[in-house]
A protein has these predicted regions:
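Terminal-region recognition feature
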Residues: 1-175
Length: 175
């Protein structure tokens, strides 16, 4: 689970600053690697120890990972919960320490104190975001829509060990 120290960045809880730093870092490394063939590029390592955070900013990190020509390895040390789970699963190569914990749940979405008509739009947006969230998981892992729907129906958090994450295709190896 090691890499070139100049290509390692840490992801904690996802907020504006942290997400923007990671997106910028990925783009800078891709710019520096532009003359190299894909096979000659040293990977970027994102160390994940995150309880989650801002979903929109997290989607920005996921898109930067997916768009990166330079390979991105995500490594979990500690926790990959909520949006941290999605980012962790989005890596091109994914590994975790043996005591890492992963967690999936329905997104947390609050309604603003506005008029009733505004609430309908907020609920529609929440559903749209939940669909994106789940589609990323279904694309990057072996989890099924049925498994995700059960968790949402039961309104619970689904915690998984590193061994579980390996079985479900959330990670590729335990290091």
């Amino acid at each position: 689970c090691s890499s070139d120290l100049n290509r390692i960045i840490t992801l904690g809880d996802i907020d504006e600053e942290n997400a923007n730093d990671i997106i910028q870092f990925i783009h800078e490394i891709n710019y520096l690697d532009a003359e190299k063939t894909e096979s000659k590029r040293e990977p970027i390592t994102i160390i994940v120890n995150s309880y989650g955070g801002d979903i929109y900013r997290g989607f920005g990190v996921v898109d930067a990972i997916k768009d990166s020509v330079t390979p991105i390895h995500t490594v979990c040390y500690g926790a990959a919960l909520s949006m941290g789970f999605i980012i962790m699963a989005s890596g091109h190569k994914r590994s975790a320490s043996k005591h890492s914990t992963f967690m999936y749940h329905e997104i947390l979405w609050s309604l603003n104190d506005e008029k009733l008509s505004s609430h309908k739009r907020e609920v529609e947006e929440g559903k749209r975001i939940m669909d994106i969230y789940d589609s990323i998981i279904l694309e990057c892992t072996n989890l099924t829509k049925k498994q995700l729907d059960i968790v949402k129906k039961e309104h619970r958090d689904w915690y998984m060990s590193a061994e579980d994450a390996l079985v479900y295709g959330i990670i590729d190896e335990i290091c």
